[in-house]
Amino acid sequence: MKEQEYFNVADIFGENVFNDSVMRERLPKKTYQKMKEVISQGRELDPETADVVAHEMKEWAIEKGATHYTHWFQPLTGVTAEKHDSFITAPMSNGKVLMSFSGKELIKGEPDASSFPSGGLRATFEARGYTAWDCTSPAFVRQDAAGATLCIPTAFCSYTGEALDQKTPLLRSMEAVSKQSVRLLRLFGNTTSQRVMPSVGAEQEYFIVDRAKYLQRKDLVYTGRTLFGAMPPKGQEMDDHYFGAIRERIAAYMRDVNIELWKLGVSSKTQHNEVAPAQHELAPIYAEANVAVDHNQLIMETLKKVAGRNGLQCLLHEKPFAGVNGSGKHNNWSLVTDDGINLLEPGKTPHDNIQFLLVLACILRAVDEHADLLRESAADVGNDHRLGANEAPPAIISVYLGEQLQDVLTQLIDTGAATHSISGAKLETGVKTLPDFMKDATDRNRTSQFAFTGNKFEFRMVGSQDSVGEPNIVLNTIVAEAFADVCDILEKAEDFDLAVHDLIKQLVTDHQRIVFNGNGYSDAWVEEAERRGLPNIKSMVEAIPALTTDKSIALFERFGVFTKAELESRAEVEYELYAKEINIEAKTMIDIAGKQIIPAVIKYATELGTSINTIKAACDANVSVQTELLVEVSDLLADTKVALAKLQEVVAEGLTMEENESRAKFYHDEVFKAMEELRAPVDTLEMLVDKEAWPMPSYGDLIFEV
């Protein structure tokens, strides 16, 4: 074991980030002040300032060892993209080169827009696209085996201005919710807050397996999840992995991840074992939404990159292993002013906090009226495997408020006024040496998709490998709409106090159906939700149409977040993505079954038959056990061959379909079903065939031997 290196986190935190302290130190005072205004007040960046910033950024990056820069952006592929350009200029007459980086190169790039998903917005011959510097998310230097690269967070749009990424609409939605939040604050006499920013913290779950074993599983390599696999004798039923002692190999990996992230200014805070064997979680401290989205991408990239260095493999798929919990990403969301006021802070007496109650009522309205959009924002091929099982919230959107706030709302609905708030009692353990302390006013509900957790909402439906961009785009926009509508009413009110009380009561009464504080895993809740008229959208394919309803188009166009064309293009991209992912999984199953499993089982059955004949020839022994096993294996082998032929047939049919939506529905209804039918006999065979004869590592090998 290598000797442990000790250090002070404060000494390395943000050392590879061109942050405010670096700008204050390196930029001329006038330039620094202009940049502060651009970042904090949303002012335009003039070319002269951009040139000065670019020069200092380049000099700083070169000191860090950087030879190249890249516009780091997030297209609709779900992962980041980048093109690297070196700082060198054309050689001079003496053969030497200079290192140069201009303001124009800083603020604008030109990747090929036709090579990324666009849903028809860009044809192959319409290649021009632009990346634009998001100066509110700091540039950073990424150091790895390939060297050091200056990474500039950017937005990505087409030549005609349509958004082709996650960041552009996210920034638009942030402006929308800020503007409407400030309107609401002004109604309550706040004249100091100038901006309100969504604050986001994304908890990241993941699996870690041994890389050598991972490389022996084509399904993991090609799709990120196991397409075959029988459960080992032990799974997660003992509840001994969650918060258990972290194994030394994993702890060393986590340490390396933290060091990388801290240097990049990502405030990695919490790490622990999750419920399933080999499953873990990393959680950062909150940041402004666009920075938090960038940081989550950095977290996922770093988890994968550092795993490889440690002989490990990080699995970010929502359901890499059947039979144990999958992975999600809890999106913690609140609204905070530029002078530090959290709009979701209820205070000690929330019944008296009228501003908070109005904000809460607006959020209930937003979630109730746009539950389909919120569900769509978490729609993902992998997420279809975990939503609705006893490991993740069901696909029905509801809001958990807890005992304290539910009691306040009940008072408002029943009497028109709330006069008291339930307080947290003292927790007494009965052990004198343990301190007594005040409990929170409400418990936590881990089965809720959208839960109030003290001073924020936690959206727990997001998939582990997805960007948190889309969920926050939707949250920001639907809340902006609710704020705008109540401001339209209250700004015209003759008696504000009376009007705001009446409006809060009306909103919580009209939208109380969205509140559910019980067990979201129960069948009874599914039935109750249906009685309440709440949508139960069970799959990604069923969720996508929410993007292009008249209501959704009107919502996003009203606040300038998406155009109709942009929404239609995203729906097309998602249909296409769904069909492609299932197609890759199906072809991988065909490949594994045909080239590995069937040959291995035939060989095993042949050896079994030879063994039976050898024993019979040697003596009159009882070979009924071997014979029964051979018959069972042979029957399952025949079932496997039939199921394989069926899967090949439906995949071929799916490939003939040209229209994205119909193809996606076919893959959901027919291809996925055929995949399940192939898996069933294969998983049974794995439990019968000699382990030495089975052609790939088992679940037990993967999740317990790391």
Regions found by a protein language model. Give the residues of each.
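Catalytic pocket of metal/acid-base enzymes, prominently hydrolases
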Residues: 1-32, 46, 128-133, 138-152, ...
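Active-site core of metal-dependent hydrolases
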Residues: 12-127
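Active-site proximal loops enriched in glycine and acidic residues that flank catalytic Cys/His/Asp
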Residues: 49, 73, 102, 284, ...
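Histidine-centered catalytic micro-motifs
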Residues: 71-74, 329-333
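Short linear, low-complexity motifs centered on an aromatic residue
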Residues: 78-94, 111-114, 119, 217, ...
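Glycine-rich, acidic/polar active-site loops that bind/position phosphate-bearing ligands
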Residues: 127-316, 325-328, 335-572
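Composition- and surface-driven signal marking solvent-exposed, interaction-prone regions
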Residues: 220-221, 296, 318-319, 345-349, ...
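C-terminal amphipathic alpha-helical interaction region
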Residues: 504-706
